[in-house]
Amino acid sequence: MDIEQVMQYLPHRYPFLLVDKVTELELGKRITAVKNVTINEPFFNGHFPGAPVMPGVLILEAMAQAAGILSFKTKNYSPEQIGIIYFAGIDGARFKKPVKPGDQLVLKAEIVREVRGIWKYTGRAEVDGALVAEAELMATLRDKP
């Protein structure tokens, strides 16, 4: 999926759209997506001047956005049809290495289960094949108003 297709499944827009493309998708199982991290990201102005590092919370948000695409595609819905999938919880978040300008952040999410509209996933973020962050994520669908 290219950026135009990604934008059909995520309501986020610049500067909070954190998925640039989807490289692998297995419906009902897993997704691999990419965020190209550039020095032009607005958060680098303050995190940290002279030693820019992508905030860990945004790495988690990028994983959650990839997981949201997986859920929408698995159910064959879009946000315009049914609503938005909200990030609802996180467990066991671990940050292993910093993500810096110029890195290509590879986002991986796998569905653990979906029960009564609550999705649980495992998420990983990698740079150059090395683990930089991991977490268990939860999300839920909020109906369209």
Swiss-Prot record:
Q: What class of enzyme is it?
A: lyase
Identify which residues the record assigns to the active site: H47
The alphabetized list of GO BP terms reads: fatty acid biosynthetic process; lipid A biosynthetic process
Q: Which GO terms describe its cellular component?
A: cytoplasm; membrane
InterPro entries attached here? FabA_FabZ, FabZ, HotDog_dom_sf
Catalytic reactions of this protein: a (3R)-hydroxyacyl-[ACP] = a (2E)-enoyl-[ACP] + H2O
Sorted keywords for this record are: Cytoplasm, Lipid A biosynthesis, Lipid biosynthesis, Lipid metabolism, Lyase
Taxonomically, which superkingdom? Bacteria
Q: Which EC number(s) does UniProt give?
A: 4.2.1.59
Q: Which SUPFAM superfamilies match?
A: Thioesterase/thiol ester dehydrase-isomerase
Coiled-coil residues = none
The record's subcellular location field reads: Cytoplasm
GO MF annotation: an example: (3R)-hydroxyacyl-[acyl-carrier-protein] dehydratase activity
Q: Which Pfam families does this chain map to?
A: FabA
Q: Which family does it belong to?
A: Belongs to the thioester dehydratase family. FabZ subfamily.
Instruction: State its role.
Output: Involved in unsaturated fatty acids biosynthesis. Catalyzes the dehydration of short chain beta-hydroxyacyl-ACPs and long chain saturated and unsaturated beta-hydroxyacyl-ACPs.
Q: What is this protein called?
A: 3-hydroxyacyl-[acyl-carrier-protein] dehydratase FabZ
